[in-house]
Amino acid sequence: MIQIRKNVFETNSSSTHCMVIGTASDFEKWEAGEVYYYDNWRDGKKFITKEEAIDKLKNSKYRTSDTDKAIKYLETYELDASDYDDDEDEAKRAIFEEMANNYVYEYDYYVNDYYEYLESEEATYNTPGGETIKVLCHYGYDG
């Protein structure tokens, strides 16, 4: 690797890297659907409740009818698949895509669909202070 700037890690610009780090309990809640992962550089990365996710969607600068469908789904967990030839999986995917457009991620969608063309890795670590943390990484070329 050629060093271009000192004290800066340079990577191939066509590669993608992302990482979610949280406590084991945060990940358990995310996997169970009790919280959502919120990834916005302005507000910081964090896990948020369903109510906070609804609030983020309601206050979106780019709110559309699809955003309203996502809000309705989060509020009621009722799914209207009529726009998707009654295919509930396709309807859910569209809702989760709209949530992702607003930086709100449901666990299964984030892990299995959002970065579907990237390599994934998940690991658990114990900190020196005794806390258990989990790390979820996606990396590779997405092009």
Regions found by a protein language model. Give the residues of each.
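Intrinsically disordered, low-complexity peptide-like regions
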Residues: E10, S15, Y37, E78-A81
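Short, extreme N-terminal segment that most often corresponds to the first beta-strand
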Residues: M1-D26, C137-D142
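Intrinsically disordered, low-complexity, compositionally biased regions/tails
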Residues: H17, D26, Y37, I48, ...
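Low-complexity intrinsically disordered segments
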Residues: K46-G140
